């Protein structure tokens, strides 16, 4: 485990207006460290997706602070937030979001194009990223020629090809069978061994717990419990009434 790569401090989020207002997050604090895979677990409607959107600089908190590599996101404009995302954050989703007319390598290379990295170097980096997830022989295949598990591997390669500080994965195994789900979690756990990178996996599936260094439980917008792989537990790490 290494230093802090991302942290949320007393984050509140109010959604909606008037009588329909909902406090989706209630003073949540969460720290992601390099060399660590963290699970964020909770039932539907617990605030998992809202917190992930804020950590991913796609949604601003109503109150509180989010820092990415020590840089606070509050007050940043859309262009500044986009720059923080490009340089620091990789995303993996339940649905793979691959372009059907592009090969696996070209889908991965897109992540470098948005960082203004092109040419032969970008092609080589895309191939290397695919090799890391076990797809060295599938670089010229199109998404329709790949299984669901292989498509998710391409999505992971795309997320890490730019060497981000943080990988945020939203239910990455939900659309996969058990065997492919294990393979994907094994890859994410391996990626999380990098001391300069933290991985956060959002899930409701307890079968993913063995892959985690730390498990954070969220309920009704509050982080109610944290556990570590060795069984150490800390209760009620957030929870404003």
Model-derived regions: residue spans:
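H-loop (His-switch) and adjacent beta-strand-loop-beta switch element
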Residues: 215-227
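ABC family nucleotide-binding domain
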Residues: 4-211, 215-218
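ABC-family P-loop ATPase nucleotide-binding domain
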Residues: 1-14, 225-241
